[in-house]
Amino acid sequence: MPTTKRASSMDSTGYDSSASTQSNQSSASALRGTFYAVYLYTSSPKTQQQQQSETETSADETSQKPVATKPPKSQTKESLSLLATDLGAIAETDLRCFLIKKVARDLQDTRGNVDSMEMTFGEKTTGTAMCFHQAFTKESSDVEKKEQQAYVLCFIAPDDGTLDLYCTDLERFGKSLLPLLTNSEVDFKSTLTNSLEEWHYICVLYTNRCVEAFAENIAVLLQAALSEAPVNVTTGNSRDKSDVEKFMEACNLHGLESQKRGHEETESGCQSPAAIEIVSEDDRLIARNADASPFCQRWAARLMKSKDDGPLVLRRIVEGFKIRTIQNLNLVKRLVKEAENDHYALFNAYQFLKKCGYWETLLQRAINEGSVVATPDGREVVDLLQERLAANALAGSQLPVRNSA
């Protein structure tokens, strides 16, 4: 929809107070307490006149008050110009005053940061909110220009832990908006604003949509994440594919488990899992030729039981699923190491793997990580466990007896 351009008014801090920068708050976002804001940050050296004025002011204060140690004054002038937001004017002012102290730190880190802040909602109501903020340096074509500029992207949500759990999703979303920031700095209404207004729907609610679309078959995605199996989504809805990809990323164990060993050490034990095919049928997503372990089925049941409790509860269940897997994996690696010299530890490893509900996945991840097969004795223990557990799956329980020769 075409918009009428207005002359923007800038205050001394670089704040663009034109009405065109602010969108109307949607009833849904106001009800959730979720908002967004985008700023253009500018940092430039202070002029000689500004520095001289500050020096004179400081001298006057010193002559009137006792001498006290003060931090050195910054030699740069910082400002934030509002580009787009759906916050009210008072709340936006709170946010801008909060951010001006954070941007310099954000520019040193490409990741996003989450902080709590006091924000005014309505005329007199003040409460604590969480703010995700991420800065992207703006490239300048003028190499001799001394000022530094950056885009600052902010998402506001209640202080309930949502932004912390979905921080990685917000970082990826922010980076995906960078081309829109650089190409649409003037007209946000037709491009960037539409994406920003959906940030909560895109970055947070995908968990609910996946659980709703897969129902109990969400266990297949959990299994694929543990097995690191590729997932191919065939659907005419690009949002479905994006949701599945984000859910798989949320379920993977990257960054939680030990680093894998070199390719030479694990090549003999690595297996490439078969790809999972997902298609859309009758508004449901169906996984073809895919099974899930009892362990993943139990965690899928927890997700289904809590499907109406909101994205925060669902994400906590996913995080619990990952933590339990890491704990079990560490236990298996410890027992296998002890079993190299202790038959009782071998028995304990066998009993645990038999009852855990996903022994094949745990052992394969341990093999891929490399430490359990780093020695001939460790390789022998793993081979024996795999042999006995496979036999048990077919013909009932058998007690493993390690060849002591």
Predicted regions and their residues:
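A eukaryote-biased sequence property
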Residues: 2-21, 37-41, 55, 207-211, ...
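N-terminal uDENN/longin-like adaptor modules and analogous extended polar/low-complexity scaffolding regions
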Residues: 2-238, 397-400
